[in-house]
Amino acid sequence: MEVKELERDKNRVVLEYVFGAEEIAQAEDKAVRYLNQRVEIPGFRKGRIPKNVLKMKLGEEFQEYTLDFLMDLIPDTLKDRKLILSPIVTERELKDVTARVVVEVHEEPEVRIGDISKIEVEKVDEEKVLEKYVERRIEDLRESHALLEPKEGPAEAGDLVRVNMEVYNEEEKKLTSREYEYVISEDEDRPFVKDLVGKKKGDVVEIEREYEGKKYTYKLEVEEVYKRTLPEIGDELAKSVNNEFETLEQLKESLKKEGKEIYDVEMKESMREQLLEKLPEIVEIEISDRTLEILVNEAINRLKREGRYEQIVSSYESEEKFREELKERILDDIKRDRVIEVLAQEKGISVNDEELEKEAEELAPFWGISPDRAKSLVKARQDLREELRWAILKRKVLDLLLQEVKVKVVEPKGEGDDSEGKEDN
């Protein structure tokens, strides 16, 4: 077998495979064995049909089977090439003692990574975030530790109302009966709850609703109305929250530590996402238009199979506009992936089995299974293992790059103009 490069356009390569007489003979023998198990020809026992008879009776069909078996030799020649698309056969022919196959392959495109330090990501001011977090948590604690005192008067803003809700269908059959507690807020507009404003203990509220063409009646009986008194912000509140706290400052420090853990996790993830979004801006890529065209067509065909294409395209000026945007998105995704791959290789970043197991354990609650089951699942499924490996690898590379980018500290939303942020390297 001879392999010749006929054409190269960036990452797209056209290869010609020429097979000799010996390889063709071996492929024909495989075709004979394959066809003898499936073809019956009068006058010959099944499985005993000679090659020359099969070639004569089947003609071009026999040649196609022979070419199929010759093509089984091609994948081994491509194993050292990293491809982003499956090989595409553009020509194949078998004549006498030579066979020729032309294959179009699309390799992973080369990238040139620019100056990472030109990328800017935003980080919300930690001190102000934690200050707001502590204030909000203290208010939550006041709400949860409110003193309740039964009252005879009507329910108003700030009160807690306990009701028994019964639901009846059109035939007046009771479907459910359950107790609920609601805290009435200022300008209350929640369904059902707003109907409790002004009601007293013993009052019954009937509300009719229609769902999917069926009518239901909701009967809410007010069992109790409580006046809520929120505790003052001070040492006594701290003591009521946890007997380990003696002062309000101790409670605030504990809440600040709690908020810091949340802040660190969420801010790191936010900065990773910002960096990932901006990576294409500093990347140049050598990729063929033909590669992008195939990827766009594959994405469109997938949307059509899922029945989502028409709906998505309808939000664009034209199908061409949609194709252009889809092409840009695909190009940016390839840039991101290639940067992660290239830098992981350059920096020696990899993912080991212990990291995969830890990731599986952390994801187990979201999957609704036990940690042991999650680890077993990852071991058993190559696709899932590769998905987790890539997620961890991407995270590691992004964390490394975050050390090089510009960081702009901005005000929390609603706290001021983000443009007045300061840089923090």
Curated annotation (Swiss-Prot):
Residues 158-231 form the PPIase FKBP-type domain. It is found in: Cytoplasm. It comes from the Bacteria. Its EC number is 5.2.1.8. It catalyses: [protein]-peptidylproline (omega=180) = [protein]-peptidylproline (omega=0). GO terms for biological process: cell division; protein folding; protein transport; regulation of DNA-templated transcription elongation. Its main location: cytoplasm. Keywords: Cell cycle, Cell division, Chaperone, Cytoplasm, Isomerase, Rotamase. GO terms for cellular component: cytoplasm. GO terms for molecular function: DNA binding; peptidyl-prolyl cis-trans isomerase activity. Belongs to the FKBP-type PPIase family. Tig subfamily. Consists of 3 domains; the N-terminus binds the ribosome, the middle domain has PPIase activity, while the C-terminus has intrinsic chaperone activity on its own. NCBIfam families: tig. This is Trigger factor. It comes from Thermotoga petrophila (strain ATCC BAA-488 / DSM 13995 / JCM 10881 / RKU-1). The gene is tig.
